[in-house]
Amino acid sequence: MSDADELFVTASPAPVARFEPTTAPHVSFVVVTYGTGWVVIEMLASLAATVGSTPVEVVVVDNPHPRLPQRVVSELLLATAGVTVVRPASNLGFAGGCELGVRHTRGTTLGFVNPDVVFPAGWLDPLLAVLDGADPPTIVAPVLIDPDGTIQEAGQTLDRTATAWANVTDPGDALIDVEYASAACWLVRRAEHDRIGGFDPAYHPAYYEDVDYAWRVRRDGGRTAVHGGVRVVHHRGSGTPGRPPSLDSQLATLRAAWPQLATTQPSPEELAAAGWRSSRQLPAH
């Protein structure tokens, strides 16, 4: 943390979400916000209510927003207890915010979650069991669903133009290997995260850093899996105000890092024929 960064732990006397202090967290959850509204409190309330007996810690990295500089902090101070808040001096983006958050965590397992997800009862233990099992994946994620229960994604891929396509076929309760999954909700062992090098801040401010991360995992012999028996609601596009950022710089970074993208990935026509859904047909993430 630089000298200009700010850090504090919330202590609301009447919290909507409370996380008990622990000296030995099993899972450290990292959340990156940027002018985020009340959805982050709803997410934290659902998280606090569903982690059960698992010792956890929560770190929120609040990137400064030019128009809403105090919005997230005010909400967290009012409605939470036991949440560590880190406020960097400048906007680090998603990747940089995640990495700053990781540096303030102690758990053996890292959970990266968006502020606009909602967790159901019983979601965490099955994902941890996958990481504890034989031949575990490097990354495990739930199926993301819309509020009406429609499958939003059970893993994703990119076509050769770098357009994202979501697998919307219901996997049932199966654990399926995927090319990558949205980092809206991931679990990964800290040792693996450190080994792979974490998220690349070159994808500032956001988008494609989860693709790059998962592709590095795959290049090094690891894999990403989605647990079909775990469904998490993702209020797509509600975590950050304003328009999504331009993707020109991030696309250039991805294509420079993975020049084989244009020749090895499937065509849009192939994915459409196989029943995948293009991100161009969906609201912003």
Where are these regions (language model features)?
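Acidic donor-binding segment of Leloir-type glycosyltransferases
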Residues: L47-R87
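N-proximal low-complexity "stem/linker" segments adjacent to membrane-targeting elements
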Residues: M1-A49
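A structural alpha-helix within SAM-dependent methyltransferase catalytic domains
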Residues: I41-L44, A48, V102, L128, ...
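Short aromatic/hydrophobic "clamp" motif used to bind/position activated sugar donors
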Residues: L110
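Short, structured coil/turn linkers that connect adjacent secondary-structure elements
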Residues: N63, C98, N114-P115
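Short beta-strand/turn micro-motifs composed of small residues
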Residues: T33, D62, A141, G228
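C-terminal subregions of glycosyltransferases and related glycan-biosynthesis enzymes
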Residues: T263-H285
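Acidic/His-rich active-site region of diverse nucleotide-sugar glycosyltransferases
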Residues: D5-P15, H26, R87, L92-E99, ...
